[in-house]
Amino acid sequence: MQKRNVYAVPDLPVKEIMQYFSEMEINIKASDILKPTPQSTQRIYEVLLEVYCGVKTSDLLPRINSGESIEAFEESLSCILLQKRMSGFLKRIGIDNFGLRDLVPDSRRLIGILSVVVNFSMFRDNKRHVYERVCQMNDEKLLLKNEIDEKVHNAKKELERCERDARKSIEEAKGVEEEISLLESELKDFYRHQRALVQETERSKTERNEYSDKLSSLKLMVLNLNQEITCLKTQIVSDPTKLMELLDEMRCLIAKESEIMKGLEVKRVGLKEKIEFMQVLKEDTMKAITLAISNREADKTIDKTNREISELEVQMKNLDSGINALKIRLNHVSRQISHIESKIFNLQDNDKRCSEEISAKLEKLKSNYGVVSDERNSIRGKIEENVRLTKSIEYELVKRRNEHANDITAIQSALCRLKDDVFNYFAEAKGIIDKTMSD
């Protein structure tokens, strides 16, 4: 079962209720409280809602220009809306049993409700400065919290942007590094190929020199043989057999020389092919030299790329330092938020403690109210007894006063009769005396 927030408020005198509402410029007559009607009761509730809640019941229901049934419907709906609004208002100040039956005129119930409203209004007026100060502090805290949240949000955005830039820079640096590594591998392959070409060129030069030396020696041998042939041609041969042997020997030598010449021709063709190949190698070498020159430009580009990488690394370091600064700032803001949250927690604890103290005081007041209520009932009983005694005494006093007045009246009438009798007696005596004196 839900705990009801109800505290007992004694009924205030009608005079005090009217005086308080007149100070608030609320026109409520004594007859509206002591002898309420449905119209006066509804008007009082509408005035209370307008003053304390800022709600006009006439604004809650749009008017429909139609027949009597629509007017009756609007009246019923306005009564229901008035009961709902008034029930919500009274629940907040401690009365949670306000229903449609309370719209029926009842002087005692109306005095009780107005007493609770006056008590709440007086308490609100007394604690208004505390409420306004707490509201101001709460608004300042909310404003500070919103500013801190906005700063944290902006810092997070800046941090995310820096992280994106850093990731982009890292990716670009990785791409540049991959391109540099690819260029380095291509350059190494090119250097290796150039080194192989240089070695092949040196070996071809060595072979060419060797073949040139062999060709020179062979040319010298041919020249010597030609000289010998010339010498032999000039010699005179006396013996034909020797001449035939010499011819055979010369034929053999010529055949050998022919074979040697064929071998030399083959070698010459091979050397010519070697020379052509060396020319091709020379052209390739020149191309390689041109490529080496272009490699220098590539080296310059690589150096420029390395410098850009260094600049990017410096920018990354700056971004890292900025990120660290933002993290420090974020930590500082987090500490401030924690400090504010701790303050809010302390304020909540203080509020809770104050609420507990107020609840304890209210419980104590409730218990004291029971004792005071008993004493008040006993005193009221004594007062009623005294009133009864006073009324009986007043009745006896009036009765005795009437009896005394009757006795006084009887005495006065008796005295008047006695006076008349004495006057008559003295008149008769005077007449007798006068008569006697005349005789």
UniProtKB/Swiss-Prot annotation:
InterPro entries: Kinetochore_Nuf2_N, Nuf2_N_sf
Subcellular localization: Nucleus; Chromosome, Centromere, Kinetochore
UniProt record, GO biological process: attachment of mitotic spindle microtubules to kinetochore; cell division; kinetochore organization; meiotic chromosome segregation; mitotic spindle organization
Predominant cellular place of this UniProt entry's protein: nucleus
Top-level lineage group: Eukaryota
Coiled coil spans: 136-233, 293-332
Keywords, in A-Z order: Cell cycle, Cell division, Centromere, Chromosome, Coiled coil, Kinetochore, Mitosis, Nucleus
Molecular function per GO: microtubule binding; protein-containing complex binding
Record family assignment: Belongs to the NUF2 family.
Function per UniProt: Acts as a component of the essential kinetochore-associated NDC80 complex, which is required for chromosome segregation and spindle checkpoint activity.
Subunit structure: Component of the NDC80 complex, which consists of at least NDC80 and NUF2.
PANTHER family in the record: KINETOCHORE PROTEIN NUF2 (PTHR21650:SF2), MEMBRALIN/KINETOCHORE PROTEIN NUF2 (PTHR21650)
Name of the molecule in the record: Probable kinetochore protein NUF2
Organism annotation: Encephalitozoon cuniculi (strain GB-M1) (Microsporidian parasite)
